[in-house]
């Protein structure tokens, strides 16, 4: 079993890390404080080739495999110290762009070149005020009217919602089909009549990425914008893309864990207490050791899940195991890092404070930790 990445992948990781350190990290603190998404920075990510990684080159992407895509998001997080930006990139790629690549017809794939270059931003709208973890209970309706569909309903907690140029909207087209069935996906463009942004939500962490409330009031969408097969979108499109989302999402978390550990080591060597650097204190050494163990285990679980998906092998349980563990490990490391920094870890001038607020998202977004446990248990019971 070879755990090494290829020389090309390692060189790519370094190039993304260095780019992020030089372009993304400056201003990360200010973007967090202001809760501001930076469109100019987004364009630079597009120019660097980070916004269409897995999409084939003929559509403007890089044709990268999922492992390389994860490496890019890990490096972006480690070098850039901006979890919000990483969240927006991950959502744009995995649930805003990949569904059009995998399920769109050739006419619909006209959206891809603008998405992969960063000219446009993508999002997916599933969650509703009364349908979060229970995605099968969505109420947003789409009714056929000649060559159009009329959408009515609201969506909440939509990453990139207020900045997206295209939103893939899940809506019920056959209410008689039962929960989880009769759901279709529609590509809705910014500016479509009846589509509006309610407001952006004020978040604890990942604050440079907008999280939005969206409204669809008699929103008329052409039938040509129906993505995939009518009535099968929740299972065929959404749940498939959740595998992409969860894996890439935790890659960003692993990159953040690496950055926190490095910062904690550096601070422990510099901070003097009782006449010597606190790195000489066994209590601090134990915290650093725990952080390293959590990081290495998280990274191995991440790339096991990514490798299984890349090889076309069963991976849903392993992806949920990885997300469940990384959610806990990222939070534990953020707490330990903050404790090492002491009082300085509690003030906003130091990135370690931001890491704790950012880390909490992983146990909630993209499927809560409780949902991951349900998926894992279901897989175990089916296997045995």
Predicted regions and their residues:
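Short Ser/Thr-interspersed hydrophobic loop/turn segments at strand-loop and sheet-helix junctions
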Residues: 49, 73-77, 171, 188-193, ...
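A short core secondary-structure module
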Residues: 152-197
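Alpha-helical interface subdomain recognition
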Residues: 1-83, 103-107, 118-119, 144-149, ...
């Amino acid at each position: 079993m070879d755990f090494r990445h290829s020389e090309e992948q390692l060189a790519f990781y370094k190039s993304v890390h260095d780019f992020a350190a030089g372009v993304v990290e400056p201003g990360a603190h200010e973007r967090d404080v202001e809760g501001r998404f930076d469109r100019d920075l987004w364009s630079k990510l597009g120019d660097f080739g980070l916004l269409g990684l897995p999409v084939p080159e003929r559509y403007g992407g890089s044709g990268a495999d999922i492992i390389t895509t994860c490496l890019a998001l890990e490096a972006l997080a480690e070098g850039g110290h901006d979890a919000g930006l990483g969240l927006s990139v991950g959502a744009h790629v995995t649930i805003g762009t990949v569904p059009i690549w995998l399920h769109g017809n050739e006419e619909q794939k006209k959206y891809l070149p603008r998405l992969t270059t960063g000219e446009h931003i993508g999002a997916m709208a599933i969650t509703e005020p009364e349908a979060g973890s229970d995605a099968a209970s969505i109420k947003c309706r789409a009714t056929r009217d000649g060559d159009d569909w009329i959408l009515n309903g609201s969506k909440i907690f939509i990453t990139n919602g207020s900045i997206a140029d295209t939103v893939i909207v899940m809506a019920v087209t056959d209410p008689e089909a039962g929960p989880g069935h009769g759901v279709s996906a529609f590509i809705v463009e910014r500016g479509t009549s009846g589509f509006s942004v309610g407001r952006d939500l004020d978040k604890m962490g990942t604050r440079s990425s907008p999280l939005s409330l969206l409204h669809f009031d008699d929103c008329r969408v052409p039938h040509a914008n129906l993505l995939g097969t009518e009535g099968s979108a929740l299972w065929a499109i959404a749940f498939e893309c959740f595998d992409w989302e969860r894996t890439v999402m935790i890659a960003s978390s692993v990159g953040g864990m690496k950055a926190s550990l490095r910062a904690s080591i550096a601070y422990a060597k510099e901070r003097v207490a009782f006449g010597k650097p606190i790195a000489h204190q066994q209590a601090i050494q134990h915290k650093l050791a725990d952080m390293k163990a959590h990081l290495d285990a998280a990274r191995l679980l991440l790339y096991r899940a990514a490798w299984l998906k890349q090889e076309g092998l069963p991976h849903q349980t392993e992806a949920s195991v990885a997300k469940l563990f990384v959610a806990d490990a990222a939070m534990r490391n953020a707490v330990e890092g903050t404790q090492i920094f002491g009082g300085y870890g509690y003030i906003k001038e130091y990135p370690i404070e931001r890491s704790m607020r950012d880390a909490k998202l992983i146990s909630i977004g993209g499927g809560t930790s409780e949902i991951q446990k349900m998926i894992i248990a279901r897989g175990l019971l089916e296997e045995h």
